[in-house]
Amino acid sequence: EERRIIIIDNASNLSLESGLKKMETIDKMSKYGITLRNQLKFIFVLIQHQAQAQEGIENQKLNKLKPSSDGLADCKTTTRDANMVIGLYSPFKYGLREYEGYDITKFRNHIRFMEVIEDRDYGANGQICPLFFDGAVSTFYELPRPDDREALQRVYNYMESRKSKTAKTFFSYRINKMNKELHRWKIFHKFAA
């Protein structure tokens, strides 16, 4: 079975439709998505960021930092058109040490939580899936449960091995570059003398 998926990344970057403001343009694109879904059976994915105000001090005080429908930037009505709204949350970004049973201090910026914010088909609202995020290659993997110590240790070991490879690679690169520059300098001075 073939599936056709259209992904728009992101709604705020859409070029304005003639005579429309940003919010109206995003809303119109969302309506196009409904048509594509209903008439052509396409899967329409509209990526939409949270408003900057959502990360403000007041929301931090109230602990309202997770993505929400009412926190969407530029056009909040797109959630009415969606079968499912999913949010990605980084507790590390807000300095949390623990979240949903996971030690954020160990994962640092390598953990995200995918939460179903709205679901009109299956009733999965509020379901959370912890994800390992490897930003170097832009991939996500589902994490083991927080009480599965062995599986989590394998993830920690993987992160440690990636960190040492990255450091070694960067270090090797710098040494090679310095050697080449030193070699050029020696040749230049030999020629100049």
Annotated model-derived regions:
Residues 10, 46-51:
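A short beta-strand-to-loop transition that corresponds to the Sensor-1 phosphate-sensing loop
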Residues 1-3, 7, 38-40, 53-193:
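C-terminal regions of RecA-like/P-loop NTPase motor modules
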Residues 13-19, 52-53, 92-93:
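Short acidic, S/G/P-rich loop/turn micro-motifs used as interaction or catalytic elements
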Residues 1-36:
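Phosphate-binding/switch loop-helix module in NTP-utilizing enzymes
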